[in-house]
Amino acid sequence: ALSCGTVNSNLAACIGYLTQNAPLARGCCTGVTNLNNMAXTTP
């Protein structure tokens, strides 16, 4: 299972986009991709 800290750190770059209508940061896309990859391989 993924820890809350792992999810938090991977989505940190998305907070402005999700809450303040800020431009989508490249780090957000990277974090989401990382989480997706971890979710597919983490029991």
UniProtKB/Swiss-Prot annotation:
Domain of life assignment: Eukaryota
Any one of the GO BP annotations: lipid transport
Keywords from the UniProt entry: Antimicrobial, Fungicide, Lipid-binding, Plant defense, Transport
Keyword Transit peptide appears in the UniProt entry: no
Gene Ontology MF terms: lipid binding
Record field: transmembrane: none
Residues in coiled coil: none
Keyword Nuclease: no
Family listed: Belongs to the plant LTP family.
Oligomeric form and interacting partners: Homodimer.
Protein purpose: Plant non-specific lipid-transfer proteins transfer phospholipids as well as galactolipids across membranes. May play a role in wax or cutin deposition in the cell walls of expanding epidermal cells and certain secretory tissues. This isoform inhibits the hyphal growth of several fungi in vitro.
Name of the protein described by the UniProt record: Seed non-specific lipid transfer protein-like
Organism the protein comes from: Raphanus sativus
